[in-house]
């Protein structure tokens, strides 16, 4: 009888050890750099999740402010939180570091100035599990940080399951699906088995998210706004600079290169052309604005022509697809500022 009781206690102990040592279901990757006023709210929203089987990887991108001091409070009080420190390399490098350190079945990215609803992980996880989907996606809300007021203009989606081709087409063309790294849950193997990393550039999400969807069997969509995107400053158009202008079209070239290497360009050529047209128009506005702000119109006509050359070059497909990042032989140049008199 005693041996039976002993065996029973041993089984309980073994199960407990297995539960304590097994990998978490979800790895949350939070890049951190200069977000001291916002990080506590972000981490509190993670700590308050109804889904508890996660690890929160806080990637310190050599943040010079007090962000990590705040993060250390969470690490000290909750074993699910940990900090990984790296030399400053930007958002993409921080995300890539987080992926390298992750062990969960799924990966979620949360920007450290944003925050999430309490059921964010639970609903995205259930959407994947119940539909046997490699990825899930939810709506999001712009949160105006200026006065702490939620903007009523939400990016709402309907509950559905998108099959592979529809999801890829929609995320490339920015039609019904946005290419942000956040507001999604990914099977970790999408990144690890296909060696997907974020390139060091602006619009790295645009250049990467279609790849993740391409390798997903399908995409489960949760029809609720569960992610809060904090708008801290001006709109994307008002903060465009020459590097962003060039990277905007280059992000499409990266996806075009990827599709051509995988023999799928023809399947999504319409979507590539649609997003090229959209970005080309955005760049026309941005180029003119750059020259107005510089009080110099010298070179503006040349820059506008270059914008069209870039778009045409990407679409002509006369360049050879490469295993790494492709080369775009054209670039818009910064206007030379005139001194105000």
Task: Show where each model-derived region lies.
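Donor-binding/catalytic cores of nucleotide-activated saccharide
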Residues: 91, 112-220, 230-240
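Glycine-rich, basic loop-to-helix element that forms the pyrophosphate-binding segment
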Residues: 1-2, 86-102
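A conserved acidic beta->alpha catalytic loop
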Residues: 52, 60-70, 87, 111
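Membrane-interface aromatic/basic loop that binds lipid-linked glycans or pyrophosphate carriers
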Residues: 18, 133, 290-341
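N-proximal low-complexity "stem/linker" segments adjacent to membrane-targeting elements
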Residues: 14-45
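Single conserved hydrophobic/aromatic residue that forms the stacking wall/gate
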Residues: 1-16
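Short aromatic/hydrophobic "clamp" motif used to bind/position activated sugar donors
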Residues: 107
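Short, acidic, metal-binding catalytic loop of nucleotide-sugar glycosyltransferases
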Residues: 44-53
């Amino acid at each position: 009888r005693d041996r039976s009781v002993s065996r029973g206690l041993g089984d309980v102990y073994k199960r407990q050890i297995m539960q304590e040592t097994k990998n978490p279901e979800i790895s949350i990757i939070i890049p951190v750099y200069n977000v001291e006023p916002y990080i506590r709210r972000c981490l509190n929203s993670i700590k308050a999740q109804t889904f508890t089987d996660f690890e929160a990887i806080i990637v310190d991108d050599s943040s010079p402010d007090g962000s990590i001091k705040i993060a250390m409070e969470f690490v000290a009080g909750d074993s699910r939180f940990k900090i990984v420190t790296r030399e400053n390399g930007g958002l993409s490098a921080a995300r890539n570091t987080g992926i390298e350190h992750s062990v969960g079945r799924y990966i979620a990215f949360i920007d450290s100035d944003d925050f999430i609803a309490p059921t964010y992980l639970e609903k995205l996880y259930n959407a994947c599990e119940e539909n046997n989907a490699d990825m899930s996606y939810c709506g999001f809300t712009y949160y105006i940080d200026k006065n702490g007021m939620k903007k009523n203009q939400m990016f709402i989606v309907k509950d559905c399951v998108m099959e592979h081709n529809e999801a890829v087409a929609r995320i490339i063309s920015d039609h019904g699906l946005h290419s942000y790294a956040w507001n999604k849950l990914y099977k970790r193997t999408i990144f690890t088995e296909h060696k997907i990393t974020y390139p060091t550039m602006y619009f790295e999400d645009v250049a990467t998210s279609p790849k993740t969807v391409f390798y997903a069997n399908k995409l489960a969509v949760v029809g609720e706004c569960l992610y809060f995107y904090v708008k801290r400053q001006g709109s994307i158009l008002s903060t465009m600079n020459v590097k962003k202008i060039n990277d905007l079209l280059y992000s499409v070239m990266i996806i075009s290169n990827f599709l051509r290497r995988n023999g799928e360009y023809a399947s999504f050529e319409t979507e590539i052309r649609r997003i090229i047209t959209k970005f080309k128009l955005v760049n026309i506005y941005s180029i003119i604005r750059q020259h107005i702000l510089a009080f110099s119109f010298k070179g503006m006509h040349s820059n506008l022509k270059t914008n069209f050359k870039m778009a045409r070059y990407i679409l002509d497909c006369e360049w050879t697809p490469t295993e790494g990042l492709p080369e775009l032989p054209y670039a818009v140049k910064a206007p030379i500022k005139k001194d105000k008199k």
